[in-house]
Amino acid sequence: LKDLNIDYQKISLENLIKKTKKRYDVLTCLELIEHVPDPEKLIKDCINITNKKSDLFFSTLNRNLISYLISIIGAEYILNILPKGTHNYKNFIKPSEFFNILRKNSLVIKNIKGINYNILAKKFYESNNPKVNYILHCRKNYD
């Protein structure tokens, strides 16, 4: 991984869009969407800061009973892995809802995977089941 020209920015996306005309080939937005008041605006901002044929990666929590039990009750209240109040269930997004936003903005969905956590091993692992937490890869395909 020598000679990579990586420019890490610690700045809000809104401010970055205002600050620069630069556009990116790859964008990651991980474990953020469920914490913002307007997820669709964030997704659109992510689209606007990327090049015409960019790859975008998003991860978030699915909205269903098992996700609520694991992510809020389990992680925040039983295991105390996360501070209480970290998540608000109403902000969780079902993959189908996420797909609709992406398609509406002309993104092509390439892949979706589940992200699971093994409490005993204290390790995350990938699965084909996006029931609780998931990561998706989509691509801009604008000419």
Annotate each PLM feature.
Residues 89-112:
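Short alpha-helix
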Residues 122-143:
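Core SAM-dependent methyltransferase catalytic element
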